[in-house]
């Protein structure tokens, strides 16, 4: 066994041992064949090699510079694009993780995005029926993509972009076969009512996406349509994960903001292995036994 491979194996064992010791028994990977304990240390080690400066250069010129995680980010986009085109939806929507808190969702009649950010995201501009943006931070939206969608007279629902779809109120939109309910939550202690939480319903199936949510915002979390089937959740920015999970009672939680490359290492906006282990354990304490991860390019539903 090579030295690097041995190091990865040790890292993975430490992750699993720590999760079990924290009361997390491994159900996090039940629905994610590609997100097994064997993958955690590999992704962690690969992303640690890429600084925010290198990531910024990649976003400008597309050069992966031999970094494995940037090559994976390119392949993830290609995988999502291919599967979106090839997938026919008859019932429950199909949901893909692209990067960070960015997702693409396909229903029987619609294709839309939430917080889509990728170097090549403009390739989706002509395909999307609408876009949802939780807040005004560069790791959650791209100006060119939003302009392109709005320029096609399609809604961009946000609390800050002055185009069709702008709102800072509690409001329900109906677009094709999708209902979207908006409400404001806090990003952190000083960005109050900065993030739009989206409650999304397609038929009898519902999704909750809370963007970046901070300490003390738990009372503002609300799901008028009952327990969401899926909650796309970032357990960072100071939110009390145990309280939030106990309140929302989602049937399934998938963590996002994994290894966001625009944040420096060990930043709480970069959900990496130490934060991840605590968050998984806290979700279990909050009562959700179906909590998992989605890496870039993974199909979630």
Question: Predicted regions: what is each one?
Answer:
Residues 2, 7-10, 16-98, 103-130, ...:
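Metallo-beta-lactamase
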Residues 90-93, 183-188:
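Short, P/G- and charge-enriched loop/turn segments at secondary-structure junctions
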Residues 91, 101, 169, 194-196:
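Residue-level marker for the onset of beta-strands and adjacent loop->beta junctions
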Residues 117, 186-249:
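Active-site-proximal loop/helix segments of hydrolase catalytic cores
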Residues 124-125, 150, 174, 191-192, ...:
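Extracellular/periplasmic catalytic domains that process cell-envelope and extracellular macromolecules
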Residues 132, 157, 181, 232, ...:
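Hydrophobic/aromatic beta-strand patches that form the interior of the parallel beta-sheet core
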Residues 135-137:
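Detector for the c-type heme attachment site
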Residues 166-181, 192-193, 222, 246-301:
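Binuclear metal-ion centers of metallo-dependent hydrolases, dominated by the metallo-beta-lactamase
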């Amino acid at each position: 066994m090579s030295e690097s491979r041995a190091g990865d194996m040790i890292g993975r064992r430490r992750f699993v041992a720590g999760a079990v010791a924290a009361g997390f028994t491994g159900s996090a990977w039940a629905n994610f064949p590609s997100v097994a304990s064997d993958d955690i240390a590999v992704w962690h080690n690969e992303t640690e090699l890429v600084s925010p400066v290198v990531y910024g250069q990649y976003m400008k010129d597309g050069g992966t510079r031999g970094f494995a995680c940037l090559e994976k980010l390119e392949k993830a986009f290609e995988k999502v694009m291919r599967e979106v085109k090839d997938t026919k939806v008859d019932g429950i929507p199909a949901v893909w993780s692209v990067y960070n808190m960015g997702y693409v969702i396909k229903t029987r009649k619609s294709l839309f995005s939430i917080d889509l950010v990728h170097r090549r995201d403009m390739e989706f501009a002509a395909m999307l029926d609408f876009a949802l943006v939780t807040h005004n931070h560069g790791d959650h939206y791209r100006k060119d993509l939003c302009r392109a969608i709005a320029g096609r007279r399609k809604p961009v629902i946000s609390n800050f972009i002055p185009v069709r779809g702008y709102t800072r109120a509690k409001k329900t939109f109906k677009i094709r076969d999708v209902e979207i309910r908006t409400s404001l939550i806090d990003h952190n202690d000083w960005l109050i009512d900065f993030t739009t939480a989206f409650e999304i319903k397609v038929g009898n199936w519902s999704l909750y996406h809370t963007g970046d949510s901070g300490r003390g915002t738990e009372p503002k979390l609300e799901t008028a349509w009952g327990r969401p089937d899926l909650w796309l959740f970032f357990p960072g920015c100071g939110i009390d994960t145990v309280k939030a999970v106990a309140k929302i009672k989602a049937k399934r939680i998938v963590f996002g903001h994994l290894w966001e490359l625009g944040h420096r290492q060990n930043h709480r906006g970069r959900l990496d292995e130490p934060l991840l282990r605590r968050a998984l354990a806290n979700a279990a304490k909050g009562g959700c036994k179906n909590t998992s991860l989605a890496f870039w390019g993974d199909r979630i539903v």
